[in-house]
Amino acid sequence: IVELAKKLREHAALEEIRIIPQIAYLAARPDEISCDPEKILYLPSHKECRNSKKQFAEHFRIFEQKANSSNPPVMAEPADAKEGITVVVNPPYPLMTTEELDAVYELPFTYQAHPRYKGKSIPALEMIRFSVCLHRGCFGGCSFCTIAAHQGKRISSRSLESVTTEIARLATLAEFRGHLSDLGGPTANMYRMQGRNPALCDACNRTSCLFPVVCKNLDTSHKSLLELYRTVRNIPGVKKATIGSGIRYDLFVNEKGFLNDEGKQYFRELVQYHVSGRLKVAPEHTQDNVLSMMHKPSFALYRVLKREFLSETKRTGSRLQLIPYFIS
């Protein structure tokens, strides 16, 4: 948006504006597409998708796979055959680095609603006022979800220092009562997770790093997240920090139990310190054939999670509930 605003302020030619990454525009003629024709990936047209569910599904399959690749192409969809109009979508900007993401959160945000809402209650704002975003992106690849289309498949994480600085700033606000309602992101427990070998990620066409099996190249360590949780618990003014974002339990359990001791420790500390009363997870369905279509793990993993949850609450004597979400 900033780059587009700069170009408009400079009265730049449309040809210059059309090459800005991450924008979409309508082209009335082929020569209005500001790109080498050989580098354009044409998707099934709007008319084809409207007339055929298979074409619509194929359109989304291509878009999802190519948009999540390391070097996505310019994508074009013929929108109006009669008028010759084509929708053109440019590739996104590169993934934000930790330093770039930290710089965003260093900006002088007021954490207040616009002055026009003075004296009015905004329920949506109250729900997230004291939540803290740890990272962007999600590699879950659920077939019904568009998070990867919005934020990408790879994780871009803030530094521990950036997170703790923001929390210390929140703790000085008069409205803060000591409760952080979320330490999360699109998926709460993907903080700092990435491929061990980036070159393998660059060559990969999978839309999910977790389905049908967890990728062997994926580093699923919860070490950085555990360090962050422990640090936050000791920040002056913070009485409780709960996790409001969803977690992917297939990152630390399988049908046999915990994948490793680190995953077990993560779940223990999550339940003991970071659940306000109900831990919400999303198995989405109970039948494995349906879950397979949804790119979700077997319901057997939820049963394992429930067993371990009940065991942990019994061990600590806590009265917590596990709430499963289902798509109806």
Give the positions of each predicted feature.
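Cysteine-centered iron-sulfur cluster-binding motifs in ferredoxin-type domains/subunits
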Residues: 130-143, 154, 160-162, 166, ...
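Conserved SAM/AdoMet-binding glycine-rich loop
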Residues: 169-328
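Hydrophobic alpha-helical scaffolding
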Residues: 90-94, 124, 128-135, 149, ...
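Two-component system phosphotransfer/interaction surface
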Residues: 2-13, 98-105, 168
